[in-house]
């Protein structure tokens, strides 16, 4: 368990080791979250049947994590962090734009995840009754922050091992949850949930793509960059997709079965996604359930903290990686305290702000993945760190595509987390308005992806072919 001293540098050949299968654990650990059970209810909320929800969850999850897998290829081919490799697309200085947005998203979501773990602990222990809710939240907060800081600061080697244990513990405890609640599933009621039309299914599918895996694309190369360059590309993509997808798919499907069996549970989940799940449990299991809730959320927070530190370096802050992670961890700690104990009305607006940033990040993701797939060779190492090199200081084409994708994407999304975000959705009148059936399906994120994919392919493919000879 050694402190990692590598930062934005290309990993030396002598340090590259391991197999593609090692990617299973960090991605599984980041996605073994009880929130996936609640997502099953959200899928049914689109007005579709259980089987439609099942197919939407499987297809949406796999497609979104395929993008994460393709992004991981960049780390294997060039052995540098994601937001350093992004310089080849946006320019060494121009990359500060998507880099800074990614940094805000990382720090924001790690703060939200720790806050959710803290709040969930308090909610769960309210049912036990013998422990003060505030004390329970303090305990949950300390555990969540400690584990997140431990992994994020010490770095890659520790994360790869820690995520394995988090995955095994959380998966086993979640399996017990399924066993304890399986009698609550009424397959007659589940089968009776009416099917929705094609529009409703597509809306749920889009929700699956955007809500489960898409947000991890800008972290992917951070965890594959230690692999040898001769590692099978198919294996890198396959193990990433398998590790990230298998547990969320199972939990979403089971969550849909629970919600389809009891409409009141669906209503409760809408108000309290984690706390509502405790109503099905015996009291003796609640303490273990609290542990699952914390560990499941911490698995994602660890990856966010580690990647936020690397991204801070990638946008030009001249400090060591572990100091960057400590700095980000301090922001996370203070931010979580503020969200949980001070600002009662700030939590949802803050989430709304992060979701708003998700649209430009989606456009960036499409541009970056397209670039990775277009290139047959590794990125030029020296030019990634030289604004006068072949990648240049600023790629105006890529930045323009990102701006267009963001404008279109924001125009086709709704954000109800705060009144000051109501300006979004200014193009929804084209497809039925803010109250239409497409309004809450995140179709704007898909359009942002399409702009990124098509725009970069049309404007960069010929240049990349010429560049590679």
Predicted regions and their residues:
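Juxtamembrane transmembrane-helix boundary signature
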Residues: 56-89, 99-114, 457-464
């Amino acid at each position: 368990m050694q402190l990692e001293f590598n930062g934005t540098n290309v990993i030396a050949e002598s340090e590259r080791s391991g197999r593609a299968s090692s990617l299973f654990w960090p991605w599984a650990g980041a996605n073994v979250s009880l929130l996936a059970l609640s997502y099953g209810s959200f899928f049914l909320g689109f007005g579709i049947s259980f089987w439609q929800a099942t197919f939407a969850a499987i297809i949406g999850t796999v497609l979104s994590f395929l993008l994460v897998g393709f992004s991981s290829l960049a780390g294997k081919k060039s052995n540098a962090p994601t937001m350093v490799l992004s310089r080849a697309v946006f320019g060494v200085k121009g990359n500060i734009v998507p880099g800074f947005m990614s940094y805000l998203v990382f720090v924001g979501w790690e703060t939200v995840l720790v806050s959710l773990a803290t709040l969930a602990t308090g909610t769960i222990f309210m049912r036990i009754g013998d422990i003060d809710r505030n004390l329970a939240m303090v305990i949950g907060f300390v555990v969540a922050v400690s584990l997140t800081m431990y992994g994020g600061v010490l770095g890659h080697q520790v994360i790869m091992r820690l995520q394995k244990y988090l995955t095994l513990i959380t998966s086993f405890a979640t399996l017990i949850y399924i066993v304890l609640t399986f009698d609550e599933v009424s397959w007659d009621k589940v089968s009776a949930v009416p099917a929705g039309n094609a529009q409703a299914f597509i809306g749920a599918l889009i929700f699956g793509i955007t809500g489960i895996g898409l947000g991890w694309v800008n972290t992917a190369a951070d965890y594959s960059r230690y692999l040898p360059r001769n590692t099978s590309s198919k294996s890198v993509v396959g193990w990433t997709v398998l590790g990230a997808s298998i547990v969320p798919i199972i939990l979403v499907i089971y969550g849909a079965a629970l919600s389809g069996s009891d409409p009141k549970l669906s209503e409760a989940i809408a108000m309290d996604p984690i706390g509502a799940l405790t109503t099905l449990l015996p009291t003796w299991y609640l303490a273990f359930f609290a542990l699952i809730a914390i560990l499941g959320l911490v698995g994602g927070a660890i990856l966010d903290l580690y990647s936020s530190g690397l991204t801070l370096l990638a946008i030009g802050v001249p400090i060591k990686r572990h100091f960057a992670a400590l700095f980000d961890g301090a922001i996370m700690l203070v931010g979580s305290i503020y969200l949980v104990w001070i600002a009662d009305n700030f939590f949802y607006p803050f989430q709304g702000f992060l979701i708003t940033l998700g649209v430009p990040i989606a456009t960036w993701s499409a541009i970056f993945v397209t670039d990775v797939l277009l290139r047959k060779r590794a990125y030029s190492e020296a030019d990634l760190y030289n604004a006068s090199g072949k990648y240049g200081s600023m790629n105006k084409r890529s930045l323009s595509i990102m701006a267009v994708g963001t404008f279109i994407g924001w125009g086709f999304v709704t954000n109800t987390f705060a009144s000051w975000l109501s300006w979004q959705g200014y193009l929804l009148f084209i497809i039925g308005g803010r109250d239409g059936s497409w309004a809450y399906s995140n179709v704007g994120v898909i359009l942002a992806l399409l702009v990124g994919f098509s725009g970069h392919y049309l404007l960069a493919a010929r240049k990349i072919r010429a560049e590679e000879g």
